[in-house]
């Protein structure tokens, strides 16, 4: 009966705004409609040690059902000051859900802090801890001063439903990329590696992974800028020329290039795995 109610909610959100430019489906509604089926398949995949299929299931859930939904509003607590509503954040958001008992890779925080220091003018970097303020104070100095550190206490938070979805449905640490309207552009698991990695290798691994989220948010900002220009009926000739130019900064261009290299390498690795499987079958 509960599943039927959730499906009806999704259907109503889909059709109640007929004629409008866009339907805003809440993240909580979408995750509730699909998480049970995903969990069953995912648990079975990992039970059979089919890691690749488990990752495929996660990507499928995110790309087919969660991207394009809108994050529900909820209350977060800073270490000092008054509680903050998620909807009060005005910039695009790079959200990381975390807990202080999670042990980051050696190069994770240096890589994250470098990106925060470079792009905080354009992006709000939010680290949301499932923990107490006393525990967060112990790790506060490890983060850039430009990072927004918040915590959620499930025992006192009134937004229990969305908090449970963020923490328990997909797990943590997790990265969420949202535009300034709180629309989900992507969700990624925080990358992990063997503890024997050197600081340099760890930094590069995490920088490349985190850069993907930054690139997604920057690319969306560029797209919105282009759409605003296209909406103008008659652009002067100089404005048309300017529109055609690459408006990215050198740093943004470098991150995009690194992401393209990452995608190419991922494709090569996928082909190699497919060939290896084919050879094994033969």
Model-inferred region functions:
Residues 1-25:
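Bacterial Sec-dependent N-terminal signal peptides
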Residues 21-38:
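Short N-terminal segments immediately surrounding and downstream of signal-peptide cleavage
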Residues 47-84:
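N-terminal "domain-start" segment that seeds a small globular fold
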Residues 84-106, 110-112:
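Short active-site neighborhood of thiol/selenol oxidoreductases, capturing the structured segment around
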Residues 107-145, 156-163:
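Structural microenvironment flanking redox-active thiols in thiol-disulfide oxidoreductases
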Residues 143-180:
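Short, internal strand/loop/helix patches
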Residues 247-277:
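Long, low-complexity, compositionally biased polyampholytic IDRs enriched for Lys/Glu and Gln/Arg
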């Amino acid at each position: 009966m509960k599943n039927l109610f959730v499906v009806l909610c999704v259907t109503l959100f889909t059709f109640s705004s007929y004629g409008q430019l866009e339907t805003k489906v809440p993240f909580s509604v979408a995750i509730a409609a699909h998480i049970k089926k995903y969990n069953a398949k995912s648990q079975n995949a990992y039970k059979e040690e089919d890691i690749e299929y488990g990752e495929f299931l996660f990507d499928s859930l995110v790309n087919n059902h969660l991207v394009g939904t809108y994050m529900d509003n909820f209350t977060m607590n800073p270490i000092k000051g008054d509680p903050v509503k998620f909807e009060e954040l005005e910039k695009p958001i790079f959200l990381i859900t975390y807990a202080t008992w999670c042990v980051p890779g050696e190069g994770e925080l240096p890589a994250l802090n470098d990106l925060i220091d470079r792009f905080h003018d354009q992006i709000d970097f939010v680290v949301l801890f499932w923990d107490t303020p006393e525990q967060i104070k112990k790790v506060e100095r490890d983060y850039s001063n430009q990072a927004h550190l918040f915590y959620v206490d499930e025992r006192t938070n009134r937004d229990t439903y969305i908090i449970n979805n963020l923490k328990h449905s997909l797990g943590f640490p997790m990265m969420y990329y949202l535009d300034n309207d709180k629309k989900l552009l992507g969700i990624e698991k925080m990358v992990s590696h063997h503890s024997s990695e050197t600081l340099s290798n760890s930094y590069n691994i995490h920088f490349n992974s985190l850069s993907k989220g930054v690139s997604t948010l920057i690319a969306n900002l560029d797209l919105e800028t282009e759409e605003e220009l296209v909406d103008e009926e008659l652009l002067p000739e100089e404005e048309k020329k300017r529109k055609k130019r690459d408006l990215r900064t050198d740093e943004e261009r470098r991150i995009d290039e690194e992401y393209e290299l990452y995608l190419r390498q991922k494709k090569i690795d996928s082909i190699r795995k497919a060939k290896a499987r084919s050879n094994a079958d033969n």
